[in-house]
């Protein structure tokens, strides 16, 4: 494998190279160009430094996807602090648990989260910052209060004449193994594990995306960020890779209902679509299945010769439903509905199914849609090794193991769980059961660990459901 470059240097280079290109937009909102992002990062760096945030300190972020969230995250990484992205769907208690367990010094919150949390239950926090405008919800130090009140003044003092590309010089991680972020698999105490993601894993995932999509996506192409950036799938493939590439990323700041997603696809026309099965299934079942249930259409689909033309027409309509400009749709994060997958394969739709885990930030397996085998989740991704722990991997399911730079450092403050997941040879035990054919295609057959996966990609532990049911009995 090639020498691993600095990931923060890639962020820096993209900002400098694409200074006057469109970077981030809240759908139906204002556009931030790369130089606007750089200015916001610079101001947050001043606030961090002036308030006493040190390299390696933890900074948590909890809110819906937005340009302001993205800037705060980039500022955290490029300052040398450790980001702790938290799913905004988590309950207040879950957010409190993660903030406390991660030793977060600062917490960025969105509008809804700001009204739900109880700061008295996070006693070690020094401040809570409102994501939309970076105002202070709470300050427990005079340094932070002063830094926010005098932020514009300090920015003007540091850059008295102008703010340009030559001023961009970010913190560069000292080692590929340096901790970049901590991503929690669940919010519940006892089930929550903080995955320590190193910079090498961020680079390796971005390099994989460049290898398989680099010649399909160009500078200025549009991308829609639908999946939560607090989930590694959305973080790596709807945000970080595209930002490094110089794309224009649109954030759906509202609840992504099928109607809102369809409107966004039609307007933005994204070049690549990253999705969990739930989104694809909802759109197909709502927009496509009703049309093909018509008796005449069903008859045409069964007639040799004619059915091929019908499939082509349906495929065109389905493609248009997703904006009509994408190279492929990459589906992952949960099991795909077999009926929907069979239909998409039948009409030769450009889709593929990948496989990953938070612990691999996230990619483990992938295949381009032209090489994809239906029912599989692709082959070992670039930089990764995958094997099945079975005496007969082609026929007898065994646990899926993987190894490579994508694999986490371990679970934060949980050596026992780390030792149970990563063996002495460096193989990560996914907890998923699968088989592998002679060509290396992996087929998932179930779970070996006691964890379920919702169709939106969120981890669900049966014990959590049991605990909740006992509370409500």
Label the model's feature ranges.
Residues 203-222, 229-316, 350:
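Conserved AMP-binding/adenylation subdomain of ANL enzymes
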Residues 387, 394-454:
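Conserved ATP-binding/catalytic segment of the ANL
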Residues 185, 471-473:
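Conserved small/polar residues in nucleotide/adenosyl-binding loops
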Residues 10, 51, 78-157:
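Structural core segment of the AMP-binding/adenylate-forming
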Residues 3, 20-52, 57-66, 70-74, ...:
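Conserved AMP-binding/adenylate-forming core of the ANL superfamily
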Residues 20, 148-184, 191, 216-222:
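Conserved pre-ATP/AMP-binding loop-to-beta segment of ANL
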């Amino acid at each position: 494998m090639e020498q691993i470059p600095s990931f923060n240097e890639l962020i820096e280079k993209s900002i400098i190279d694409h200074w006057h290109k469109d970077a981030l937009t809240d759908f139906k909102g204002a556009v931030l160009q790369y130089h606007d992002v750089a200015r916001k990062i610079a101001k947050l760096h001043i606030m961090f430094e002036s308030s006493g945030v040190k390299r390696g300190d933890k900074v948590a972020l909890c809110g819906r996807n937005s340009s302001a969230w993205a800037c705060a995250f980039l500022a955290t990484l490029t300052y040398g602090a450790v980001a702790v992205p938290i799913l905004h769907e988590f309950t207040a208690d879950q957010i409190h648990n993660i903030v406390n367990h991660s030793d977060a010094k600062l917490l960025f919150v969105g509008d809804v989260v700001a009204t739900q949390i109880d700061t008295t239950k996070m006693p070690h926090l020094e401040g809570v910052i409102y994501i939309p405008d970076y105002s202070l919800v709470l300050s427990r130090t005079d340094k932070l209060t002063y830094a926010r009140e005098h932020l514009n003044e300090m920015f003007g003092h540091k850059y008295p004449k102008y703010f340009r590309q030559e001023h961009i010089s970010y913190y560069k991680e000292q080692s590929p193994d340096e901790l970049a972020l901590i991503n929690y698999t669940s919010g519940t105490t006892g089930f929550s594990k903080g995955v320590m993601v190193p910079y090498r894993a961020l680079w390796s995932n971005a390099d994989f995306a460049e290898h398989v999509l680099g010649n399909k996506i160009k500078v200025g192409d549009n991308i829609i960020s639908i999946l939560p950036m607090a989930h590694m799938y959305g973080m790596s493939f709807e945000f970080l890779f595209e930002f490094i590439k110089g794309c224009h990323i649109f954030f759906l700041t509202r609840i992504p209902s099928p109607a809102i997603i369809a409107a966004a696809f039609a307007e933005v026309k994204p070049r690549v679509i990253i999705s969990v099965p739930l989104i694809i299934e909802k759109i197909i079942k709502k927009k496509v299945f009703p049309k093909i249930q018509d008796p005449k259409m069903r008859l045409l689909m069964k007639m040799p010769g004619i059915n091929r033309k019908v499939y082509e027409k349906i495929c065109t309509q389905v493609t248009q439903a997703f904006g009509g400009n994408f190279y492929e749709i990459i589906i992952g994060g949960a099991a795909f509905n077999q009926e929907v997958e069979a239909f998409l394969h039948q009409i030769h739709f450009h889709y593929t199914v990948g496989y990953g885990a938070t612990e691999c930030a996230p990619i483990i397996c992938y295949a381009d849609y032209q090489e994809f085998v239906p029912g599989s989740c692709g082959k070992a991704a670039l930089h990764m090794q995958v094997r099945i722990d079975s005496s007969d991997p082609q026929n007898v399911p065994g646990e899926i193991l993987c190894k490579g730079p994508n694999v986490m450092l371990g679970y934060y403050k949980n050596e026992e769980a780390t030792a149970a997941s990563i063996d002495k040879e460096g193989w990560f035990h996914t907890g998923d059961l699968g088989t592998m054919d002679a060509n290396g295609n992996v087929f998932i057959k179930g779970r070996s660990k006691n964890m379920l996966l919702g169709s939106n990609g969120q981890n669900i532990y049966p014990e959590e459901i049991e605990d909740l049911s006992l509370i409500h009995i």
